[in-house]
Amino acid sequence: MGAKLRREWLSQVLGEGTRVRPYLATHMPTLDRTVVPALAGDLRTADRREDWESEVPPREAAAAKGRDLLGGDGLACVTCHRFEGNPGLLMSVLDLAWSRTRLEWPWFRRYLVDPAAFRPGTRMPSFWPEGHSAMPDILEGDTARQIAAIWAALQEARVPGAEPAPY
């Protein structure tokens, strides 16, 4: 969790019970706020990936292309995921718009390439198996550029209500 979640989000989850998956019956317990800053820091330290630390999110990525990739004519992420408060077409799991608030870029970049490596048993497929894009006509099929474009689109995404649900 320390390499995946931004420190601010981790602190919110631990101290306030903030969540983005209201469909789950289980959740993290809310902890005494006096221990949250140290625990959040300790979790990040314990999960530190030194080889990831110098990575910074892309600054100039094609957010419009990222939205295309997220949509039904692209990788169809919106088939399963909520996006900007809109339900997924078949399921309505985690709203992708919260990614910018929750996730660290280095983790996100690696997760998209191989979700099963991070979450064995996940239903989320890899859209870049063996480094080859499922959408070769978008951004010349370049894996790094496509993932950067998705990240850019998520940085601009809106969530109605703008606050995740507390317990």
Regions found by a protein language model. Give the residues of each.
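Gly/Gly-Pro-rich "capping" loops immediately C-terminal to redox-active cysteine motifs
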Residues: M1-L10, T30, R82-Y111, S126-P129
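Flexible gly/pro/ser-rich segments immediately N-terminal to CXXCH heme-c attachment motifs
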Residues: M1-K4, H27-T34, P57-A61, D68-G72, ...
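Periplasmic/extracellular electron-transfer cofactor-ligation site
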Residues: R19-P22, G71-V93, A117-P120, V159-P164
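Short, structured interface segments
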Residues: T30, V35-S54, I150-Q155
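An amphipathic alpha-helix signature
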Residues: R7-S11, G15, V36-A40, W105, ...
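A cross-kingdom feature marking solvent-exposed beta-strand/loop segments within repeated
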Residues: P22-L24, H132-D137
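Electrostatic cytochrome c docking/interface patches
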Residues: D47-G72, G161-Y167
